[in-house]
Amino acid sequence: MSGHDSGNARRGRASFGAFVRKPVERGAAASTGAAAEQGSLEAAQDWPDDAVEVGAVVDAYGLKGWIKVAAHADAGRGGDALLSARRWWLERGAERLSVRILQSKTHGDTVVAQPAGVDDRDAALAMRGFRVFVRREDFPALAADEFYWVDLIGLEVVNEQSVSLGKVSGMIDNGVHSILRVEYPTVGKDGAPATDERLIPFVGVYVKTVDQAARRIVVDWEADY
């Protein structure tokens, strides 16, 4: 909503989730107020450049037009993006919509929300299968030593000897801590150019610094590990 990782990694643990399907309950709710009630589902003519996929509509919730969303992160992390954003961007096949969110809250392992213009259960059921996107600028602010996974993708990874280990191609949550997926160029058995991947735990014993401005992560990791 992804989710985010923290500078706590530098202290030996990662306290953030990521855009993976591991939601947990969080009881906060949000509302845009009466003015938002004038909104409705709209065709998305201009898709935001910073749109990040944070979930998917999986079902209706109740009888009054609420929808149920499986967040691609725990509800206290990437789910925060769903709860904080007052406008969601929806995509299903070639169909793209923009919707104002009147209310949202966690419900068990999901986030439930009331979109403007969706007034009954049938209309909510018709929204199943939409992927949900939120603008990156609408994500909740993090502490200085915390990072959203989406912001780590593409950063160069180097070790303390300044040897390049590749670039972050993705993240994994193994249930205990986060793991960097680092892709690097290599040569295949046939001599043709290829790519390979190394997995580096995002914990303090290995991750020394994360410099988003320089787009670089420094790790205690050898190239031949």
Curated annotation (Swiss-Prot):
Keywords, comma-separated and alphabetical: Chaperone, Cytoplasm, Ribosome biogenesis, rRNA processing
Taxonomy, superkingdom: Bacteria
InterPro entries, A to Z: PRC_barrel-like_sf, PRC_RimM, RimM, RimM_N, RimM_N_sf, Transl_B-barrel_sf
Subcellular location: Cytoplasm
Gene3D superfamilies cross-referenced by the UniProt entry: PRC-barrel domain, RimM
Keyword Thylakoid: no
Cellular component GO terms, alphabetical: cytoplasm; ribosome
Main localisation: cytoplasm
Keyword ATP-binding set for record: no
An individual GO BP term: rRNA processing
Domain PRC barrel residue range list: 144-225
NCBIfam families from the UniProt entry: 16S_RimM
Family note: Belongs to the RimM family.
Entry's free-text remark on domains: The PRC barrel domain binds ribosomal protein uS19.
Protein name as catalogued: Ribosome maturation factor RimM
Protein source organism: Burkholderia vietnamiensis (strain G4 / LMG 22486)
